[in-house]
Curated annotation (Swiss-Prot):
Keyword Transferase: yes
One function term, GO molecular function aspect: transferase activity
Stated family: Belongs to the polysaccharide pyruvyl transferase family.
EC number(s) given by UniProt: 2.-.-.-
Biological process, per Gene Ontology: polysaccharide biosynthetic process
Keywords: Exopolysaccharide synthesis, Transferase, Virulence
Domain of life: Bacteria
Function in brief: Involved in the biosynthesis of amylovoran which functions as a virulence factor.
One family name in Pfam for this protein: PS_pyruv_trans
Name by which UniProt lists this protein: Amylovoran biosynthesis protein AmsJ
InterPro entries: Polysacch_pyruvyl_Trfase
Pathway this chain belongs to: Glycan metabolism; exopolysaccharide biosynthesis
Species this protein is from: Erwinia amylovora
Length: 415
């Protein structure tokens, strides 16, 4: 059986890396004879970080070739043309499928199925081009499985029309949390193919490395030397306007959380799930460095600058006492490796995943960061640590069972 995994942006976002590694681990757990191809927008860094061969995303490369007015018009018409050809009717069927999309569609004939790997991928702010791979797979008449997704918000009519078209035609849309389902229902998006599932980052097989790098060993020793709380931060854009919070306000508020944890006797280590490797446009390390301006005891605050992959981050987080994560997948990786985490939900996905785990109290909105109430929440976690640690372990195990069952069901339906 030959399967194509699409939708990975880059493993330079270690959350995307964990999502991809998890589905691969789960597929191989179920069947050892699978032939799996993977494509990514940034194949070089993704291959390096995942430690296996990854092919370039040809559709993404095409969008980088030209940004002329004609190219923009073509991209705007693309979904209408593709949908008309998939339907086999409509005015836009008179227009040819763009050559690069037809070429990609033809290449899909060698695969038994296409799996669109999860994450927060189908978001109105990201635009309709996110549906290109799925539209090509539907045109090629290949089974399409979307596994481990958060979808929405749905506040743009054009985006919603394409979402309805695609989501009604895929074999299954496996959601990793229920808040997305509520958003779909509220916006009138079809839910007939929805299956409740899990974030595939929970399916990463936790393991140690046979030959850990010296930089990993260094940070393991640093973390082991003093009781440690890990944090992850990010540039809030493009969500800052929806949140009504500026980047500086966010950083100042997070600085107060760090100071409170240091006063409680912890060192705080900033890890990053997104770095600028291979020209990736986000580098959380820069935000973490700026945060240092608001830390009072600077010798108790450290910023990790190394390029660790998601597995190495998990190994480091396993040595920490708690994770406070703006990046959802820092919280997921942390919990998967045995360390409780508080997730700051700047998007609905963090709250949704924590609800899915049965741990809604471990999600905290950005407002709680701004008004400082998150500090009391974190202190409450630390005061009841053993009980919460056990709750997290049970919840993660249930997610693994659910996620691996869905993988098994998908493979059975493919044949």
């Amino acid at each position: 059986m030959k399967i194509l995994l699409v939708g990975n942006h880059t493993c330079g976002n270690r959350g995307d890396g964990a999502i991809l590694r998890g589905i691969i681990d789960s597929l191989h757990l179920e069947r050892t004879d699978l032939d799996i191809d993977i494509i990514s927008r940034f194949p070089t860094s993704s291959s390096y970080l995942l430690q296996q061969n990854i092919l370039p995303d040809e559709l993404f490369l095409e969008t980088k070739k030209s940004n002329s007015l004609v190219a923009k018009v073509k991209r705007r018409l693309m979904p209408k043309i593709m949908m008309a050809h998939i339907r086999g009717s409509g005015f836009f069927k008179n227009l040819a499928v763009p050559e690069y999309l037809q070429q990609f569609t033809d290449k899909l004939k060698q695969y038994d199925a296409v799996i669109q790997v999860g994450g927060s991928f189908f978001v109105d702010l990201y635009g309709p081009l996110q549906f290109e791979h799925s539209l090509c797979a539907l045109l090629a008449k290949k089974p399409v499985y979307m596994i481990g997704h958060s979808v929405g918000p749905f506040q743009k009519e054009r985006f919603n029309q394409i979402a309805n078209f695609v989501f009604s035609r895929v074999n299954s849309l496996v959601l990793r949390e229920s808040v997305s389902l509520e958003m779909m229902e509220k916006a009138g998006i079809t839910t007939q193919k929805v299956i409740p599932g899990a974030d595939t980052a929970f399916l990463v097989r936790t393991r140690t490395l046979d030959a850990p790098g010296h930089n990993l060993i260094h940070w393991q020793n640093q973390i082991a030397a003093s009781k440690t709380i890990a944090i992850t931060v990010r540039e809030l854009a493009p969500f800052d306007k929806r949140l009504g919070v500026t980047q500086q306000e966010y950083e100042m508020a997070f600085g107060k959380v760090i100071n409170a944890m240091i006063e409680r006797g912890y060192q705080v280590v900033a890890l990053s799930t997104c770095t600028g490797i291979d020209s990736y446009h986000r580098d959380d390390r820069m935000v973490a460095i700026t945060l240092g301006d608001y830390v009072q005891q600077k010798d108790k605050y450290r910023v990790v600058m190394d390029e660790f992959n998601d597995l190495e981050l998990g190994i480091l987080l396993a040595g920490c006492h708690l994770t406070i994560g703006t990046r959802l997948h820092s919280a997921i990786i942390s919990m998967n490796f045995g360390t409780p985490a508080v997730a700051i939900n700047y998007e609905h996905k963090s709250l949704g995943v924590m609800k899915q785990l049965g741990l809604p109290e471990m999600a905290s909105d950005v407002q709680s960061l701004m008004d400082g109430s998150i500090i009391a929440k974190v202190n409450g976690v630390l005061d009841n640590y053993e009980e919460i640690e056990q709750q997290v372990a049970r919840a993660v195990e249930q997610e693994r069972i659910l996620g691996n069952k869905i993988t098994a069901d998908v493979l059975k339906s493919i044949g």
